[in-house]
Amino acid sequence: MNSPSESRVPSSLTQDPSFTASPALLQGIWNSTQNISVRVQLLSVSPTTPGLQAAAWVPFPTVDVPDHAHYTLGTVILLVGLTGMLGNLTVIYTFCRNRGLRTPANMLIINLAVSDFLMSFTQAPVFFASSLYKKWLFGETGCKFYAFCGAVFGIVSMITLTAIAMDRYLVITRPLATIGMRSKRRTALVLLGVWLYALAWSLPPFFGWSAYVPEGLLTSCSWDYVTFTPLVRAYTMLLFCFVFFLPLLIIIFCYIFIFRAIRETGRACEGCGESPLRRRQWQRLQSEWKMAKVALIVILLFVLSWAPYSTVALVGFAGYSHILTPYMSSVPAVIAKASAIHNPIIYAITHPKYRAAIAQHLPCLGVLLGVSGQRSHPSLSYRSTHRSTLSSQSSDLSWISGQKRQESLGSESEVGWTDTETTAAWGAAQQASGQSFCSHDLEDGEVKAPSSPQEQKSKTPKTKRHLPSLDRRM
């Protein structure tokens, strides 16, 4: 570690019994020792410095920080990990157990819970164990695998949140377009694309484009955002553009148009007067908007959790890694991993059907949430309309008007329609047959058709008519 210019004491002199060290020589030896100590400390704090990466692996370096710093971070990450695993496992179990929650839209929520569960499962125990020993314990291969898992599951969560925002955008602004699109099979293909996209951005460090290295207090690993080389900086720049900033812009775009659609629909409903239709349409839109707000809260918390870590990485990308301390890297990393606990907590507080399902399948947890099992069953009704109902030419209005709100756990059809989609489909069909948009009345499978002038004169209580035809392949 010593440079040629540093003061050294020849071994031949130290072995001479008559040798006496002068004060000046002792001071030179002390200065040389101090230089060695400082250089070793710099090497341990910045293992990603160019030219020193290979030396950082054997043995793994440590950072000269108080022991309580390691223990505190280790305890926090353990609590975060346990909460994330138990909470997301509850979400997965509840959504999969309840038929009324197994819809194409909720498949995205289940995927988010799966990625958050795996994030907590793969990151927290390893981080905690290394913090107890105040150094990385799992070797170079373990470091790469740990960082790879963190990258994959973090990217999957971000892209899944983007897909949720797009789903809410389509349901609220273009409900007719989603009738034939939102099937479980197509949603599964979307989720497959999400995982492949995450793998595409997580595998390059294994092949020499950037690297997975220790970071912060050197008890966790991440991709190399410190090395100031064109190849590493290019990977960091593209990663931020296509994994963070672009999805964030898409989410902002979706919610801007959701706000506009709700405002315009509210104004349109005002022209219908104080009719039951107006109230029901507004209630349906409000229901969809409540779900959109839940998704928006999850997205905002996720972005806020990753913002400090992204800032640290961008500082390293800009070439100012020398101002980053071990704490400045480790604390944001813990905050980012805490994003895995937001999803189950928010849904347990704000999602009425999820709360009711918990009360039914997990009564003990339902008591903690203040939800009664007996009272929750009616709210589990999954309101949907079969495509065959709208596509059948032989269905009459008297049969439809006899259908009341389903008090079951769900429809077995592949496509679960929301209230907004059903309203839009019926409204478009009525418009195609020359009827006014404000003249029909539809609520959860109950349809009341307007009567023609001849029917009003004859005051016929019921008239059989056929629904407009819709393609069965929608």
Curated annotation (Swiss-Prot):
Eye; expressed in a photosensitive subset of retinal ganglion cells (at protein level). It is found in: Cell membrane; Cell projection, Axon; Cell projection, Dendrite; Perikaryon. It comes from the Eukaryota. Disulfide bonds join 143-221. Gene3D superfamilies: Rhodopsin 7-helix transmembrane proteins (1.20.1070.10). Keywords: Biological rhythms, Cell membrane, Cell projection, Chromophore, Disulfide bond, G-protein coupled receptor, Glycoprotein, Membrane, Photoreceptor protein, Receptor, Retinal protein, Sensory transduction, Transducer, Transmembrane, Transmembrane helix. It is a multi-pass membrane protein. The chain crosses the membrane at residues 73-93, 108-128, 145-165, 189-209, 239-259, 294-314, 356-372. One of its GO terms (molecular function) is 11-cis retinal binding. GO terms for cellular component: axon; dendrite; membrane; perikaryon; plasma membrane; sperm head plasma membrane. Pfam families: 7tm_1. GO terms for biological process: cellular response to light stimulus; detection of temperature stimulus involved in thermoception; G protein-coupled receptor signaling pathway; hyaloid vascular plexus regression; optokinetic behavior; phototransduction; regulation of circadian rhythm; retina development in camera-type eye. SUPFAM superfamilies: Family A G protein-coupled receptor-like. Residues 428-474 are annotated as: Disordered. The modification N6-(retinylidene)lysine is found at residue 337. Residues 94-107, 166-188, 260-293, 373-474 are cytoplasmic. Residues 1-72, 129-144, 210-238, 315-355 are extracellular. Its main location: membrane. Glycans are attached at residues 31, 35. Photoreceptor that binds cis-retinaldehydes. Contributes to pupillar reflex, photoentrainment and other non-image forming responses to light. May be involved in the optokinetic visual tracking response. May be involved in the regulation of retinal hyaloid vessel growth and regression. Belongs to the G-protein coupled receptor 1 family. Opsin subfamily. This is Melanopsin. It comes from Rattus norvegicus (Rat).
